[in-house]
Amino acid sequence: MTATTQADRYISFSGIDCDGNAKIVLERVVALVALPEYANCFWDRFLIRLAEADKVGARKADELCLACSNTYYIEELFEAAGDEMGLAALRRLEDECC
């Protein structure tokens, strides 16, 4: 997609890097939950599920599904951390892919 063309998932996913968008969001999540102030049981389980996302035969959800199905929790995490870049990446993921 060019900078002047708005991606519209309702027309086509062509040209939208949903896996890349999810990876950006998930990398920010992993970095934040590694900090003691954001770590908790939910994120511990989330990280286990994220590790399983790479195992095609064993996974229940891939990275995109995992990110899209937890947007509310991820948004809460980014807001608590003041992570504006994370929030922008999450918005893009939601708008283009989820």
Curated annotation (Swiss-Prot):
Keyword Electron transport among UniProt keywords: no
A biological-process GO annotation: nitrogen fixation
InterPro entries with a match to the protein in the record: CowN
A Pfam family of this chain: CowN
Record's keyword annotation contains Membrane: no
Purpose of the protein: Is required to sustain N(2)-dependent growth in the presence of low levels of carbon monoxide (CO). Probably acts by protecting the N(2) fixation ability of the nitrogenase complex, which is inactivated in the presence of CO.
Protein name (database record): N(2)-fixation sustaining protein CowN
Organism: Paramagnetospirillum magneticum (strain ATCC 700264 / AMB-1)
